[in-house]
Design a protein with these regions (language model features):
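Non-catalytic beta/alpha edge segments that cap or flank active sites
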Residues: 1-162
Length: 162
């Protein structure tokens, strides 16, 4: 697998109920639409259960395939919300500013944004980004940072002229 294109992305929905077919995945397709509108080419989507090892393995696979891996779901404080832990286990560096920006924007709409534990980090030349599971919160969080993602990927490519 080769992360050749600067604007390729993968979208992973983390949800036990969507994984077993009890609930339709609405957040994943909404994120795909937002990314495509921002000229990202989404080359992989999948639905995974809230299982830390499975999430971590797919994050690694997708980071070798794409430049941006976006997850939705599993970022809250419930016992099975393990997406941040899986992400922290595979990234090399955190990008706290992106995390903070998403929570700040979310807090403008609801105080519950403070319960999101989503992280953002770097693995190789790939950016990994955790979004909330709620479709509206996922889209709003992505919209808060989507404008800076291309520049972040350029920086990961070593393009530091600015």
């Amino acid at each position: 697998m080769n992360a050749a294109s600067a604007k390729t992305a993968a979208v992973l929905t983390i949800s036990d109920s969507s994984y077993v077919g009890k609930r339709e995945d609405v957040s994943g397709p909404a994120i795909v639409r937002e990314l495509e509108a921002a000229n990202f080419k989404v080359v992989h989507t999948s639905i995974l259960p809230d299982e830390k090892d499975l999430i971590a393995a797919r994050l690694i696979e997708c980071s070798e395939l794409t430049r941006l891996v976006v997850t939705t779901g599993g970022t809250g404080i419930a016992a099975r919300d393990v997406t941040p832990e899986a992400t922290l286990g595979v990234i090399e560096r955190r990008v706290e500013g992106i995390e903070e920006k998403m929570r700040q924007e979310g807090a403008k709409k609801t105080p519950f944004a403070a319960l999101s534990r989503g992280v953002c980090g770097v693995r190789g030349k790939t950016l990994l980004l955790n979004l909330p599971g709620s479709p509206s919160a996922a889209v709003e969080s992505l919209q808060a940072v989507i404008g800076i993602l291309p520049h972040a990927l350029e920086l990961l490519d070593g393009k530091t002229d600015h």
